[in-house]
């Protein structure tokens, strides 16, 4: 099993700072879990025109990420509450 590093877009950390601390921590912990279980998860594209962008659900939240297997990097693009997706 390969180890993957995490990269967060700057806006994500600002958004998480506005959340209840326990939920922010849970979402951060889940991104670490995704990176450490990358080979055990099924990464389906979220749309045909967004190849490489995947999502993972945590309660009412969605984590959008991409994987750079050459550089062993999981890039977290956004963490969004499902109401904001409509």
Predicted regions: what they are:
Residues 1-26, 58-62, 66-86:
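Enriched for short, Lys/Arg-rich terminal
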Residues 23-35:
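Compact soluble domain cores
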Residues 32-57:
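A short, surface-exposed loop/turn module that caps and links secondary-structure elements
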């Amino acid at each position: 099993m390969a180890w993957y590093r995490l990269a967060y877009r700057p806006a994500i950390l600002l958004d998480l700072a506005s959340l209840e601390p326990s939920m922010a921590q849970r979402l951060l912990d889940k991104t670490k879990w995704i990176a450490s279980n990358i080979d055990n998860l099924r990464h389906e594209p979220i749309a045909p025109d967004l190849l490489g962008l995947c999502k993972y659900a945590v309660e009412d939240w969605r984590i959008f990420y991409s994987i750079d297997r050459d550089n062993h990097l999981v890039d977290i693009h956004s963490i969004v509450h499902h109401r904001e997706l409509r």
